[in-house]
UniProtKB/Swiss-Prot annotation:
The keyword Calcium does not apply. It catalyses: 4-CDP-2-C-methyl-D-erythritol + ATP = 4-CDP-2-C-methyl-D-erythritol 2-phosphate + ADP + H(+). This is 4-diphosphocytidyl-2-C-methyl-D-erythritol kinase. It comes from Nostoc punctiforme (strain ATCC 29133 / PCC 73102). Pathway: Isoprenoid biosynthesis; isopentenyl diphosphate biosynthesis via DXP pathway; isopentenyl diphosphate from 1-deoxy-D-xylulose 5-phosphate: step 3/6. It is an enzyme of class 2 (transferase). Catalyzes the phosphorylation of the position 2 hydroxy group of 4-diphosphocytidyl-2C-methyl-D-erythritol. It comes from the Bacteria.
């Protein structure tokens, strides 16, 4: 039976602006998304039965239909029934390294890897844009996870405009294992507290979303100016998450107070906080300093870096 191993990178938000409400009930967003080296490994294998099986090494990750990787396989079965009938079922094994419920798109990147893996298993020959379009029906982050690199994301996050890739900006990530922030809660609370400032007119919504293309952080990315990028980090959701989660706020403050940190911010709806560095040595030094400043076994810390790719095939059998 054929099989593929794929690398599924996490992502962080370098910029997240909530512009207003969309007619479909989602928020209109303007974001800059960045792939990072912290990754899961996904193995996708053909099996002789007409079923979908998911295995995962992490006890908190479900292996049933509530798992986005499972739903990605279901989507491919529905979309390509003839290929399913010809090649049989799929077994998916997730080796989880990305923290769960962390605002790092762990579920979305696993789903993206399954789409890419099944495309290869079933010899469908789908283009990247076709894979992204399929991914968009599963979740807002899935299209970016297919493509990876650095990109502006607008709409609900599924409309992508690639930017020149940022390579080798070093990052320290911090996340409390037992702490989760509900993404729906974060957006709902933001709407309750700051909805008065939302843009309502549809044309103005689109114009404001497109304004990010000429914004200061995009200019810094185009010039590959790491220090300026770090100074222009922005996340509207910090306005509701940080006051409600003192641990996240404290972690962010500890990062901000360390020498060598160019900038720090919460990623997505949290609770992961990240800091940017010019060198791996500085990142590793600050990781140790943060570990000494916050003595808590529940706190996970990782050193990683920006990367230029999304889903990547590492081997096939």
């Amino acid at each position: 039976m054929r099989s593929y191993s794929l690398i599924a990178p996490a992502k962080i938000n370098l910029y997240l602006e909530i512009i207003g409400d969309r007619p479909d009930g989602y928020h209109e967003l303007a974001m800059i998304l960045q792939s990072i080296g912290l990754s899961d490994q996904i193995d996708v294998r053909s099996i002789s039965t007409d079923s979908i099986r998911v295995h995962c090494n992490h006890p908190q990750v479900p292996t049933d239909k509530s798992n986005l990787a499972y739903r990605a396989a279901e989507l491919m079965v529905r979309q390509f029934p003839e290929a399913f009938a010809k090649y049989g079922g799929v077994e998916i094994t997730v080796n989880k390294q990305i923290p769960v419920a962390a605002g790092l798109a762990g579920g979305s990147t696993n789903a993206a890897a399954v789409l890419v893996g099944i495309d290869l298993l079933w010899k469908l020959g789908l283009t990247q844009s076709e894979l992204e379009e399929l991914g968009g029906t599963l979740g807002s982050d899935v299209p970016f996870c297919v493509a990876g690199g650095t990109a502006i994301a607008t709409g609900r996050g599924e409309q992508l405009s690639p930017l020149p890739s940022l390579d080798n900006i070093y990052i320290v990530l911090g996340k409390y294992r037992s702490l989760e922030v509900s993404t729906p809660w974060a957006y709902k609370t933001y709407r309750q507290q700051f909805g008065h400032s939302y843009i309502i007119d549809t044309d103005n919504l689109a114009a404001r979303a497109s304004a990010v293309h000429s914004g200061a952080i995009v200019k810094a990315i185009l010039h590959k100016d790491t220090r300026e990028i770090a100074q222009k980090l922005h996340n509207d959701l910090e306005r509701v998450v940080l006051p409600a989660y003192p641990q996240v706020l404290h972690l962010r403050e500890v990062f901000a107070n360390q020498e060598g940190v160019l900038g720090t911010m919460m990623s997505g709806s949290g609770p992961t906080v990240f800091a940017l560095f010019e060198s791996q040595q500085q990142a590793e030094l600050v990781l140790q300093q943060v570990r000494e400043a916050i003595i808590d076994e529940d706190l996970e810390l990782f050193v990683t870096r920006t990367i230029t790719h999304g889903i990547k095939v590492t081997s096939s059998v």
